[in-house]
Amino acid sequence: LLEGAPAHRRGLVASLASAASEVGALLAVGVSAVTVASMDEASLQSWGWRIPFLVGAALAGAVWIARSRMEESPEFHRQKAAGTVPESPLRHCLGKHRAAIGRAFAISALGSITYYVGITYVPAFLTSAGALSEKASLWLSTIAAVAVIVVTPFVGALSDRIGRKPVLAALSLGNVLLPMAMFSLMASGSHERALAGAVILAALAGGVSAVGAVATAEQFPGEGRVTGLALGATGATAIFGGLTPFIAQLLVERTGAAIAPGAMIAVVGLCVLPLFISMKETAPLRPPKTRQLSG
């Protein structure tokens, strides 16, 4: 998507892919909710639980067909024509793009912890903290997911207009200052405060996801880009992704501090902020606007 997008619209196009992943998550919740609501307990336990998986399998098949018919990006065709496709992408990346791998790691680290702690973990936090019932926390998380879908394209478009660097730096600073207060709000027992905290956390995570999608890819030239992303971005997701909700819950239980998950996000935000401030801008220069002379 990014390599085939117009240079001055890469942020928006890449952010739409991030927003689409949230649409998929909402669809999963919706299919599950309809299945549960439309069946009795015995039927659900016997065979009904398979319905969401069957819907997912059908969608996966449709996506596979669509992906199999996609053409290679113009960037890859350029590399083939120029004879610059690396024979060993891994050696090429480790030899020439180690710093870029580190930057991609930092961007993805912030994106991963904001998503997995600031969105994925929130329903469990609300339920375990006793602030909301399980049903209420799931509805609240659904609203937060909608907020992500709305925010993401706007942040992607903003990064096209003012650049990736200022957007990343601002979001990093926001993730230093706000998450602890938001988790404190969500633990207050008030539905309104919990909603505000969850939506703000979701907006921060969606913003990082939006600009991170394009900023990580732009750290590398076309040659070795996918390998660089696999090493940097995917590596950070493995570290700061799946286990962080478990660690967040463990910290809450051991310390009794509701703000502990927010502190996790803040620490990562503080660590990557200096890098975001000092890194070079990767967004292409916007084409100058031409004025039409009258008369």
Kindly label every feature range from the protein language model.
Residues 21-67:
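Helix-loop-helix hairpin linking two adjacent transmembrane segments in secondary transporters
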Residues 68-89, 285-291:
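Flexible cytoplasmic inter-helical loops of multi-pass small-molecule transporters
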Residues 97-148, 241-245:
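Extracytoplasmic gate region of multi-pass secondary transporters
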Residues 161-172:
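Cytoplasmic membrane-interface "Motif A"-like loop-to-helix N-cap segments
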Residues 173-189:
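C-terminal ends and interior cores of transmembrane alpha-helices
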Residues 222-254:
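A late C-terminal transmembrane helix in Major Facilitator Superfamily
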